[in-house]
Amino acid sequence: MVLTQNVDTFSGMISANHKSKVSSDEDDDDHGSRSVRTQSLPFSVDALMSTKERSESTSQGSIHMTRIINQDDRSIYSDSVDFIKRRESAKEDSAWINKPRLSTSPRSQSPTICPLRKHKTNRKPRTPFTTAQLLALERKFRQKQYLSIAERAEFSSSLSLTETQVKIWFQNRRAKAKRLQEAELERFKMASKPILHPGLTLPFPLCTQPQTAALVCGQSFPFSRHMLPFAPIGIYSTPMGYSMCHLSKDGYSVEPV
């Protein structure tokens, strides 16, 4: 009876241990399957958090690498710019040293063209007249400034020239004569102007008669004597002034110096 109870008790203990072991195995299996399930689910909270942490660490690492690369690029760029500047300054210094102090500009072989004068490319050269031809042309021009067609043909054949050459020479000679005439007329106008400068005025009028001078301007002077008569200024070749004339002994006439 007692043995039967002990056997039952032992079997119950074995079954209890077996059940607890089975339950623990089942718990372990459930935990493993849960962890597997948790790892296998990509949209779970843990997966999202772990992904975010990994992305943040990756982005920080990339930013750090980018900064390092940018710093390297800047240092390389600054070094290259400094090198270029030093090379340019060295070139300028060498050019200044090698350049002579007094550099003579190369002379141009061709004559310079005046910009104010129109140069014709197809202009014919001037005809080299001989001395005999020039004397004959001048003598003919003094006789007659305009030649007819027949006279020009005859005259050109006598000088062994073409009619065109004679015609052009007469045209140029008439233009020269006109210029000389205008210059002579201008010189004559300058010579015919009054000698006394318009800005130079005398303190008293020029009167030819003492009575007229006394009547016109005798009261404007504190002296009681009459105005002195003056001869016309046109007869004097130099401007008239106080130092150019003196009074005579009688005090009424003026004599040029």
From Swiss-Prot:
<dbReference type="InterPro" id="IPR009057">
    <property type="entry name" value="Homeodomain-like_sf"/>
</dbReference>
<feature type="DNA-binding region" description="Homeobox">
    <location>
        <begin position="122"/>
        <end position="181"/>
    </location>
</feature>
<feature type="region of interest" description="Disordered">
    <location>
        <begin position="18"/>
        <end position="62"/>
    </location>
</feature>
<feature type="region of interest" description="Disordered">
    <location>
        <begin position="100"/>
        <end position="124"/>
    </location>
</feature>
<dbReference type="Pfam" id="PF00046">
    <property type="entry name" value="Homeodomain"/>
</dbReference>
<feature type="compositionally biased region" description="Polar residues">
    <location>
        <begin position="101"/>
        <end position="112"/>
    </location>
</feature>
<comment type="similarity">
    <text>Belongs to the Msh homeobox family.</text>
</comment>
<dbReference type="GO" id="GO:0006357">
    <property type="term" value="P:regulation of transcription by RNA polymerase II"/>
</dbReference>
<dbReference type="GO" id="GO:0000981">
    <property type="term" value="F:DNA-binding transcription factor activity, RNA polymerase II-specific"/>
</dbReference>
<keyword id="KW-0371">Homeobox</keyword>
<dbReference type="InterPro" id="IPR001356">
    <property type="entry name" value="HD"/>
</dbReference>
<dbReference type="InterPro" id="IPR050674">
    <property type="entry name" value="Msh_Homeobox_Regulators"/>
</dbReference>
<keyword id="KW-0539">Nucleus</keyword>
<dbReference type="GO" id="GO:0005634">
    <property type="term" value="C:nucleus"/>
</dbReference>
<comment type="function">
    <text>Probable morphogenetic role.</text>
</comment>
<dbReference type="InterPro" id="IPR017970">
    <property type="entry name" value="Homeobox_CS"/>
</dbReference>
<protein>
    <recommendedName>
        <fullName>Homeobox protein MSH-A</fullName>
    </recommendedName>
</protein>
<dbReference type="GO" id="GO:0048598">
    <property type="term" value="P:embryonic morphogenesis"/>
</dbReference>
<keyword id="KW-0238">DNA-binding</keyword>
<dbReference type="GO" id="GO:0000977">
    <property type="term" value="F:RNA polymerase II transcription regulatory region sequence-specific DNA binding"/>
</dbReference>
<dbReference type="InterPro" id="IPR020479">
    <property type="entry name" value="HD_metazoa"/>
</dbReference>
<keyword id="KW-0217">Developmental protein</keyword>
